[in-house]
């Protein structure tokens, strides 16, 4: 029997659900629909709650530029869908002492974005694979003794490792 491994997603992968454009990722639309609908065999999918806050901050930034209240309303429209995905578990690193401690160490090691530190710390605390496109954060994780062994995958790694047969 295959071990079930936690897969912790960075904010990038939920932004399209809020109508926020992201960098071009191979077959993102096709495979993200499968991920949200069916999950991923052999994995428990986690979304740190700080990703939701980060999405709201990004919408706020768009709102400031456009002064269009519909931009902010996209959060209220998208959040029920995200919460209804049975394939995704929300993890709150702010309520997990180990995740907080690790996030502080990542911040101290030089990563400027505390939200990113909390998201990465979630992957370490859950002993899972961290799915991210953040190269700078990945580099910092590899130099910290307690985070250097965390598995880090990009979207292309996920496609190559888990969706190759599709």
Predicted feature locations:
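Active-site neighborhoods of divalent-metal-dependent phosphate/nucleic-acid chemistry enzymes
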Residues: 87-133
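Acidic, PIN/NYN-like endoribonuclease modules and their adjacent C-terminal/linker elements
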Residues: 1-4, 92, 120, 125-166
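Acidic, glycine-rich loop-and-strand cores that form catalytic or ligand-binding grooves
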Residues: 78-81
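Residues that scaffold the ATP/ADP-binding catalytic core of kinase and kinase-like folds
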Residues: 16-18, 58, 140, 162
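Short, well-structured N-terminal submotif of metal-dependent ribonuclease cores
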Residues: 1-47, 61-75
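Alpha-helix capping/helix-boundary segments
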Residues: 13-14, 51-52, 118-119, 136-137
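Short His-Asn-centered micro-motif
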Residues: 9, 49, 132-134
């Amino acid at each position: 029997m295959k071990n079930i491994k936690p897969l912790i997603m960075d904010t990038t992968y939920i932004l399209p659900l809020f109508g926020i454009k992201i960098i071009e990722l191979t077959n993102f639309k096709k495979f993200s629909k499968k991920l949200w609908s069916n999950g991923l065999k052999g994995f428990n999918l986690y979304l740190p709650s700080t990703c939701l806050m980060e999405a709201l901050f990004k919408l706020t930034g768009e709102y400031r530029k456009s002064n269009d209240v519909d931009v902010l309303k996209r959060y209220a429209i998208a959040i029920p869908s995200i919460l209804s995905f049975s394939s995704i578990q929300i993890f709150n690193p702010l309520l997990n002492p180990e995740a907080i401690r690790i996030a502080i160490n990542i911040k101290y090691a030089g990563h400027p974005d505390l939200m990113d530190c909390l998201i990465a710390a979630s992957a370490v605390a859950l002993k899972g694979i961290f799915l991210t496109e953040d190269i700078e954060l990945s580099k910092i994780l590899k130099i910290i003794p307690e985070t250097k062994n965390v598995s880090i995958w990009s979207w292309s790694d996920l496609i190559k490792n888990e969706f190759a047969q599709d």
